[in-house]
UniProtKB/Swiss-Prot annotation:
Functional note: Hydrolyzes ribosome-free peptidyl-tRNAs (with 1 or more amino acids incorporated), which drop off the ribosome during protein synthesis, or as a result of ribosome stalling. Catalyzes the release of premature peptidyl moieties from peptidyl-tRNA molecules trapped in stalled 50S ribosomal subunits, and thus maintains levels of free tRNAs and 50S ribosomes.
Family affiliation: Belongs to the PTH family.
Subunit structure: Monomer.
Positions of the record's site feature: Stabilizes the basic form of H active site to accept a proton: 92
Gene symbol of the encoding locus: pth
Protein name: Peptidyl-tRNA hydrolase
Length: 187
């Protein structure tokens, strides 16, 4: 059962519209859909809230910058005594095109610095990941420049569509039906 949903991104207006903030876009949509206003909480190094689906679920958008996301996740997990297997981390994914969304259980960080830090801080990679496709840069554009740039209008629409697909499956996912959600999203 998922008790904490974390949306990854970078804080501040300079990053609001960048691909790397797909996790923030998800968490903000989820909070808004449930009438939840995320508030800054210094002890958790992020914006936090809670929604009630089948059970209360904590929401977190770390304000530590991507590479230090683990600080916020570990602080909240320790405070609420949430084991890694009850955490869902939502993040941008270079390996999938815009509009693609996938669930992954456990695993490595795949070069994603936010995931790398969360794994280091939790001492485990045993959390669920909701991977929102943003695609790869074309030509010789550096990956760092790509993820820190705004997507095209069509890519942003595709990413928004992926977020909506994921939100439509969320109750089922939170109830622990990971395989069924994988079957719905991985088509």
């Amino acid at each position: 059962m998922v008790r904490l949903i974390v949306g990854l991104g970078n804080p501040g207006p300079a990053y609001d519209r960048t691909r790397h903030n797909a996790g923030f876009w998800f968490i903000d949509r989820l909070a808004a859909a449930h009438g939840c206003v995320l508030r800054e909480e210094s002890r958790f190094h992020g914006r936090v809230g809670a929604i009630n689906l089948t059970e209360p679920v904590h929401l977190l958008a770390p304000l530590t910058f991507m590479n230090r996301s683990g600080l916020a996740v570990a602080a909240m997990a320790r405070f609420y005594k949430i084991a890694p297997e009850h955490i869902l981390v939502v993040h941008d994914e270079l390996d999938f095109g815009p509009g693609v969304v996938r669930i992954k259980r456990d695993g490595g960080h795949g070069g994603h610095n936010g995931l790398r830090d969360i794994m280091a801080q939790l001492g485990s990679g045993g959390f669920l990941r909701l991977r929102i496709g943003i695609g790869r840069p074309a030509g010789s554009m550096a990956v760092a420049d790509y993820v820190l740039a705004a997507p095209s209008v069509s890519d942003r629409q595709a990413i928004s569509g992926a977020i909506e697909k994921a939100l439509a499956c969320l109750s089922e996912l939170l109830a622990g039906h990971v395989e069924q959600v994988m079957n719905r999203l991985h088509v």
